[in-house]
Amino acid sequence: KAREGVMEFLLINHPLDCPICDQGGECDLQDQAVAYGVDFSRYREPKRAAEDLDLGPLVETHMTRCISCTRCVRFTTEVAGITQMGQTGRGEDSEITSYLAETLNTELQGNIIDLCPVGALTSKPYAFTARSWELEKTDSIDVMDALGSNIRLDCKGREIMRILPRNNDSVNEEWISDKTRFVFDGLRRQRLDRPYVRRNGQLVPVSWEEALEEAINAIKGKKIASVVGDLVSTESIYALKRLSDGLNGTYECRVDGSCLPVSDRSGYVGNAKISDLDGSDNIILIGTNPKIESPVFNARIRKAWLNGAKIKLIGPNVDLTYEYSCLGSGREDIENLINDKNFILSNKSIIILGQGALADTDGFSVLQAVKKLVETFNCKLLILHVSASRVGAMDIGFTHPEGIDRALDGADVIFNVGMDEFELPKDCVVIYQGSHGDRGAHRADIIFPSACYTEETGIYVNTEGRPQLALRANFAPGDAKENWAIIRALSGKLNCDLGFNSLSELQSQLFDAFPHISKLNEISKSEWLNSDFKGFSSNLPFKVYYENFYKTNPIARASLILNNLSKSKNADNQIRAAE
């Protein structure tokens, strides 16, 4: 009876929007009203109405539906670290609003859509496209960064309609970034749906048989080098490695020049877990901007800061969502910490090393210096990657001992699987296997259209070394095939037996060769190799790795939602005249 009374008060000013509300079918208020409410209203007075807010291109507002639970205010303030939302007024006049009618300026704003228990905050891009009970739901893993956030893909027919977070307290808790959530329209645009071959300077569509024949003619008797991009599953990389080994070719995954050690797993994963941040008392960021490189990871650092952890930074000054003290901007500042007898870190301290420090000429020296710092204070190290496929590729040895330049040196043919962020040599034949008509496809002589991460099952190893399984939610468009299947078909034409004919056989082979990858959702302990620090060859400051959070891969670049968001962010960053 008490709950019935509370429900009556909650519904006094609530509009009867359920038939047209996007929250219908998954609305907390709707469920509670059905369970504890009554089927009629005794309220005869005029209902309150509120003006809708403009929070930007992602979050749609219907403030008349708001029940003033303040979840959105608490999230933006406590988790996202911005003070742009609040509650004004008292009693019946109270309402949620934004400060000076500003739009939200955070990479995590989409999470308030999930937190809202009613239909006051909904997704603008998803508005009126589907009902929740029409959608087929599939568990998967995000590949927009290397954190490995757990996600749910909601499909209607062959299209991904929306992407939602899944709870995993060890990785992303219950949050995902806006890039993860709103990249789904990029899965439909600029897609490669048929094979192409370059003839007379033009790419012309051909059959699979013709494309494979062209590739065989290009490869036979030639030196081949293989490279992979950021979004490729570990199984596909392993299949490519097997093919390259059979053809006596070279291969490399560190296309950005990142100086990650080939035989030292502790040097490219570290010895800390993401969850260790919660109990840390000092966090040192070196050559990284986690707010851009991994917004959900950055929210975890903010959580530690709220719990009393002190944040320190070595690198360029960046706009983070918490206070930090700057210890310097470059390499020599790491060495100064090692030699500073007054500088103390406890064993609960964590050093986070980013790609802005590693993807440079003396990145190996930086890594060894940081390992020396870890050994000096007996603290922990976590390498923050930006590529979802990088750790898995490193684990299976998809590397050249001397890096990307030596791997490509003298190659007649380059087999490029999903790599669009690196300029390839112009004096060789390029076979591009990918899902989107991006930079890699423009450079290609032969194109194999492949599935993207939502269209094939695969394992991704995240930045802390945790293997996670992403399940297929829908099928690739047109004649596009799964990555591993294309490599298997090509190997058959080249009479190079890879020993598998199905994904399960490929996974069995992979698990036999690298047993730790079979332990899904577990972090295998890495042997710590002592530092070999001998000084730096340069004194340059560290650089920012990413300039544009919303354009880091071909799927994101194809997304109209993210492109519009990128433009609005750039406009917000412009210097304005004072009013």
Feature roles, as predicted:
Residues 251, 255-520, 576-579:
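Non-catalytic alpha/beta scaffold blocks inside enzyme catalytic domains
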Residues 1-341, 356, 549-579:
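N-terminal export/assembly segments and adjacent metallocofactor-ligating motifs
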Residues 4, 31, 128, 170, ...:
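Alpha-helical structural elements
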